[in-house]
């Protein structure tokens, strides 16, 4: 028997009204390479994170920048204050592995593994009293 699906978002586990989430599934980048970039922006303000992603010369930074802009748009849609947003969670989970065979000498073949990622960015509003100077 399957799990009962809850249609009301407020009853889902882990849902908070002051958060905005953006998820990219099956990204064609290794989780290890994506984590290198996501570790840099975790905990930062949204503006600072966007600047960092623009200057980091990695392909994962372009993917994360696009996903962060999507999360910001989701926050704007929910009516959150964009000036108080920070990155609460930025993770790259392992996705499926695409396998293909490359022919080699003497009738052999070697397997090439193309690793995919599921990247999640969660933005949250800073509480009113905890503003930084």
Swiss-Prot record:
InterPro entries: Ribosomal_uL22, Ribosomal_uL22_bac/chlpt-type, Ribosomal_uL22_bac/org-type, Ribosomal_uL22_CS, Ribosomal_uL22_sf. Keywords: Ribonucleoprotein, Ribosomal protein, RNA-binding, rRNA-binding. It comes from the Bacteria. One of its GO terms (molecular function) is rRNA binding. GO terms for cellular component: cytosolic large ribosomal subunit. The keyword 4Fe-4S does not apply. GO terms for biological process: translation. Part of the 50S ribosomal subunit. Belongs to the universal ribosomal protein uL22 family. This protein binds specifically to 23S rRNA; its binding is stimulated by other ribosomal proteins, e.g. L4, L17, and L20. It is important during the early stages of 50S assembly. It makes multiple contacts with different domains of the 23S rRNA in the assembled 50S subunit and ribosome. This is Large ribosomal subunit protein uL22.
């Amino acid at each position: 028997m399957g799990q009962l699906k809850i249609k009301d978002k407020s009853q889902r586990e882990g849902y908070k009204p002051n958060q905005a989430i953006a998820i990219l599934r099956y990204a064609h980048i290794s989780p290890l390479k994506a984590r290198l970039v996501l570790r840099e922006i975790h905990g930062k303000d949204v503006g600072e994170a966007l600047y960092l992603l623009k200057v980091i010369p990695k392909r994962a930074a372009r993917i994360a920048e696009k996903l962060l802009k999507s999360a910001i748009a989701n926050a704007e849609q929910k009516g959150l204050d964009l000036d108080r947003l920070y990155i609460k969670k930025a993770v790259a989970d392992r996705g499926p592995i695409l396998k293909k065979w490359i022919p080699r000498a003497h009738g052999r073949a070697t397997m090439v593994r193309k690793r995919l990622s599921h990247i999640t960015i969660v933005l949250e509003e800073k509480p009113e009293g905890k503003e930084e100077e």
